Amino acid sequence: MLQIARRLSRTNVDAVWPSFILPRKRREGPVLSWFSVPLAALTARAWIESIDAALAASSSDVLPDVSALMQRFVVACALDPVHRIPRCIPELGRATDKQHVLLIDERASGGRFDADPKARRASFQQMMAAAVSAHPDAEFWLARSSAPGRGPWLSCACELPAGIRHFDSAYALGASVPHVQHVYTVAAPEGLYAMMSDTPAHVFGTPYYAGWGMTDDHCSQPGRRSRASLAALFHVVFVRFARHLDPVTHELGTLDALLDFIALQRAVTTRYEDLRHVAAIRFQWWKRPFATPYLNAGGGDLRWVGNASELLAGEHAALWGARNAEGLRDGIPMVRIEDGFLHSTGLGSDMIAPQSQVIDRRGPYFDPARPSDLTALLNDVDFPPFELARAAALRAEIVRLGLTKYNLGRRAPTWRAPANKCIVLVPGQVADDASIRLGTRGITTSEALLHEVRTRRPDAFIVYKPHPDVLSGNRVGLVNAARLADAVDVDSDLISLIEVADEVHTLSSLAGFDALLRGKSVFTYGLPFYAGWGLTHDALEQPWRKRTLSLDMLTAGALLRYPLYWDWTLRLYTTPEAVIRRLAEPARRSLGKIRGNPIRPMFKIVRWTRNAFRHAVWQIETKQGPKR
């Protein structure tokens, strides 16, 4: 669990252990924050004495931005697990005459420096009795701590108050603590939430935050000689003694950067919080591990079914791309999932893990018969200046790094066009692809498109680039283009061709979007998502368009707002900036042979086997099935 921590902690320390930020189990991903403290001994007393000494030395020299950092810590609900909704549970937000008293439950065996299980059970019983005695008319809430531990919950060995209510674990505890009047805990990390929200914290154990004069302590707190402020304590524990992983570079970073990352996780969960129960229909086994983190964006449960008739009440149906929804009962909500526009360093059909995917509640973005979530974003969102600036910077970096959807490698063209000739690139597409079936009218094949382009540009130097999925043999769509094009390029990479082209003519290929990002003239003959906004020359009228867009607005909608990005190392959601950083180096490799490569089928077999194994492990770990 601490491999990254130990690799990054270069100082000579005696103890390294996980901090309390964004807790998760070992199988869920690497630790993101850890303590690195020179302890005289690996004991609770030594830990407290280190804090005390640091407070005595630095209490008058707290960094000026600690208060702002603490506020961000609370807003991000930094001590809650990744998929918690960062809002107060509805019942606590309602006006009532009764006091709300929160009791935090913990595991019998707690963290590194907690007392033994017997002592902790006794402390919990004492805590329960004290809370009932002090607040006989209160409404009690029991919430389970997210801190790692083993054994039964302490509440299992204790008689609970009559009418006690159980906290809904879908919500972040940090967002609800400000709405209670008292918090009772033995030693849960979430007790810090009470202190940071000015809620009285009643402590019956010896956590690091107790004993400094800011908590109501019901037992001896040895080793505390200082009386520091909450800001000073926070600074010592989470800034001075803690180390944090930078989620973009995967190197040592700052708490501020980690809080940005946690805020992103909260935003994703909030965006997809309605997807609490998802049934994915007819997904191939090799795709399941790749789709899992995206379909789990709402933090609920996910199961795989073979037919739409197997859906249960309250479930969302999930379909891949434009797959047929036949058999789905009326009224069942549905989402569609598809590869994002910054996908990977290999073909999706070669079973390469996707760095981004899109989840659309309305319909596939490549189906012009109906609006999609992307269409709605591009029509209706008032992109603020900072977001447009971010989009411009992202676009510039994508262009600088030569990135596209699949990033198979780079190879410049070897042909040379005659001087003063307009170079027109015609990217091929997969003949049976949904974007062709749904997104074309009249001209529906690459051959017909080449005929049309030659008619429109009789004197141009036309370059035809077959689709890599077709060259690989994974999909159909080979055409005899030699009689219509001046060059049929099967060796160069797409971005190198776009860079030398003057114009790009396409049915609905994503290459048109790549060309727009690079300032090229783009002519469309189908109905792609990027057409119809005033940025392209379109042969067809584009439906569902309400306004014109700038290139930065299109980029903001298509690359910032619409997709989900996933870090397969950290196993958390990430940003497009982080994804392009990881794609950059492998994307620079020399483009290998795609067509006729004899070892490609072997690699596909290995990947299929690996993905099927991962999916089987995931099923076992999560005990697949509805949890209601």
How would you label these PLM feature ranges?
Residues M1-R628:
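Catalytic-core helical/loop segments in enzymes performing group transfer/polymerization on anionic/lipid-linked
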